[in-house]
């Protein structure tokens, strides 16, 4: 899933440089959603790891 987040990020950057507003906003939106999903998964796994150590 991280692979797809990076792909959409690169597509958003390229579209932003070329000035394609519709493509850029859609790709950036998907990349932003994936970023927050990974952030939540990271925090949950971090908390689970800390709880298991105790």
Swiss-Prot record:
Family, per entry: Belongs to the UPF0391 family.
Its transmembrane ranges are 3-23, 30-50
Species of provenance: Rhodospirillum centenum (strain ATCC 51521 / SW)
User: One Pfam annotation, family name?
Assistant: DUF1328
Does the keyword Transmembrane feature in the UniProt annotation? yes
Q: Which InterPro entries match?
A: DUF1328 (IPR009760)
Q: Which domain of life is it from?
A: Bacteria
Keyword RNA-binding among record annotations: no
Which parts form a coiled-coil structure per UniProt? none
Keywords (A to Z) from UniProt? Cell membrane, Membrane, Transmembrane, Transmembrane helix
Q: Which GO terms describe its cellular component?
A: plasma membrane
Instruction: Give the membrane topology, semicolon-separated if more than one.
Output: Multi-pass membrane protein
Q: What subcellular locations does the record give?
A: Cell membrane
Q: What is this protein called?
A: UPF0391 membrane protein RC1_1636
């Amino acid at each position: 899933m991280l692979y797809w987040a990076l792909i959409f990020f690169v597509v958003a950057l390229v579209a932003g440089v070329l000035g394609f507003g519709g493509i850029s906003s859609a790709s950036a939106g998907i990349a932003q959603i994936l970023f927050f999903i990974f952030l939540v998964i990271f925090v949950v796994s971090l908390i689970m790891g800390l709880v298991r150590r105790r």
